[in-house]
């Protein structure tokens, strides 16, 4: 029985990458833009029901809720070839249509006002599932809607569905993308730390560099960057949709990657990468070649994160016609060459999940791979944003913008709380590099989490 996943797309960025994700899933499952299964895909062995359900006329509908405070992106989706794919009852656009003005406080406050309407959509989707496993949130943490509305939604999902998993695909910003983004990011990272079970970090700087350096695109567009993101998202869910013996549900994936509750921020790598699946610069793909490339810094989608620190866990999702003995030999070669540095207190091994490729897409290569990795160096991206926040906060820069919203009109306690959580997260990732990490925080009575506490998902396996 498939374990269903509901996708919540929040804000401009969240809906843009969500749209690309659904396009990719439709292609991989042989579903046309109107949700109708193509004749050639009728006898497929895939699990479409994880992300889609069938309407009364048997066309496929994404288990998705689309949310934005301004109409432009969702209106574009509704005017596209995929306009009839989505359930129109699951689309929310704010009546005022003015957006959140890149203000986390406005996004959060607006979400609080309409929470009943949003939760009704989500509850309806949940009630239509036979065995709901969890939720996926797509959003950016830099602007107002994805960060503020997304933060509020994370809190409510955690309260409303305490035993369901929450995974996010969170886009981290390019420098100076939004003037108040250090505030928005800090407030969002607190919620991602406390209310999500797994966060896939999508670093816009790294994605842009990959598009320029690897794909040779001089000035990448948002659409091209989002296409890279959708490739990663689709690959990270492939074992759920084309199940094998292992990692065929979300809980299995997350449990293999997240050893302690708060250290659940993942980085990704993908190879071979091409915006046109029929053309790629990699002439020959073997399991060893793919697995070696996944460990190269230039292929990792978080800037500079693996230059220092150590891996806590690695899961490689290998797609294609693969001989398991080649996987074993490749792992042995990587171990001999010490291509991956692991933390001293855990298993120093790369986990591998083998998955089928969609038979409906001619990818032009035999083997492809996605790396999902938990690495202590991820703290570098938090440290940059945290330092920017501290610089702003010392000067009280732009703080009047936030004081105009309900959550900050009386005090700034929420900033202080977020500061504490993010600083602790940075410290914990640094501590995880040392052998005595299992005792980390044991003398601190105020710690909200004990690193030895089992993650939420371990209770529902």
From Swiss-Prot:
Signal peptide from the UniProt entry: none
Protein residues bound to GTP: 142-148
Major place of residence: cytoplasm
GO molecular function, one term: GTP binding
Localization annotation: Cytoplasm, Cytoskeleton, Microtubule organizing center, Centrosome
Key words, A-Z: Cytoplasm, Cytoskeleton, GTP-binding, Microtubule, Nucleotide-binding
Gene3D superfamilies: Helix hairpin bin, Tubulin/FtsZ, C-terminal domain, Tubulin/FtsZ, GTPase domain
One Pfam family here: Tubulin_C
Entry's Gene Ontology BP terms: cytoplasmic microtubule organization; microtubule nucleation
UniProt KW Nucleotide-binding keyword: yes
Family listed: Belongs to the tubulin family.
The protein, known as: Tubulin gamma-2 chain
């Amino acid at each position: 029985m498939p374990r269903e996943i509901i996708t919540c797309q929040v804000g401009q960025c969240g809906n843009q990458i969500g749209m690309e994700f659904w396009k990719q899933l439709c292609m991989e499952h042989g579903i046309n833009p109107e949700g109708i299964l193509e004749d050639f895909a009728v006898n497929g062995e895939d699990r479409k029901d994880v992300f889609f359900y069938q309407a009364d006329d048997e066309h496929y509908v994404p288990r998705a809720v689309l949310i934005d405070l301004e109409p432009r992106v969702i209106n574009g989706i509704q005017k596209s070839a995929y306009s009839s794919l989505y359930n129109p009852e699951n689309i929310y656009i704010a009546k005022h249509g003015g957006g959140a003005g890149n203000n986390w406080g406005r996004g959060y406050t607006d979400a609080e006002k309409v929470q009943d309407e949003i939760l009704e959509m989500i509850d309806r989707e949940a009630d239509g599932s036979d065995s709901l496993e969890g939720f996926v949130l797509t959003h950016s943490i830099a602007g107002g809607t994805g960060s503020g509305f997304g933060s509020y939604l994370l809190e409510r999902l955690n309260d409303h569905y305490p035993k369901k998993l929450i995974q996010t695909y969170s886009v981290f910003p390019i420098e100076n993308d939004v003037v108040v983004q250090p505030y928005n990011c800090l407030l969002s990272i607190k919620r991602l730390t406390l209310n999500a079970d797994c966060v896939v970090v999508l670093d816009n700087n790294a994605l842009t560099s990959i598009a320029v350096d690897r794909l040779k695109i001089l000035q990448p567009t948002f659409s091209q960057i989002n296409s890279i993101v959708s490739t990663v998202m689709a690959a990270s869910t492939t074992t759920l949709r084309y199940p094998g013996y292992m990692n065929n549900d979300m809980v299995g994936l997350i449990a293999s990657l997240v050893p302690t509750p708060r250290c659940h921020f993942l980085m990704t790598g993908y190879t071979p990468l091409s915006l046109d699946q029929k053309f790629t610069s990699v002439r020959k793909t073997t399991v060893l070649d793919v697995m070696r490339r996944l460990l190269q810094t230039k292929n990792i989608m978080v800037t500079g994160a693996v230059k220092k620190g150590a891996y806590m866990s690695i899961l490689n999702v290998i797609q294609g016609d693969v001989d398991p003995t080649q996987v074993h030999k490749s792992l042995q070669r990587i171990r001999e060459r010490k291509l991956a540095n692991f933390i001293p207190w855990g298993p120093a091994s790369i986990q591998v999940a083998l998955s089928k490729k969609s038979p409906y897409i001619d990818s032009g290569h035999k083997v492809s791979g996605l790396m999902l990795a938990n690495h202590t160096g991820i703290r570098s991206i938090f440290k940059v944003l945290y330092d920017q926040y501290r610089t702003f906060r010392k000067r009280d820069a732009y703080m009047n913008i936030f004081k105009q919203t309900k959550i900050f009109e009386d005090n700034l306690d929420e900033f202080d709380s977020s500061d504490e959580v993010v600083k602790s997260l940075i410290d914990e990732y640094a501590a995880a590099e040392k052998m005595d990490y299992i005792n980390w925080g044991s003398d601190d009575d105020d710690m909200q989490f004990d690193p030895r506490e089992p993650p939420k998902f371990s209770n529902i396996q």
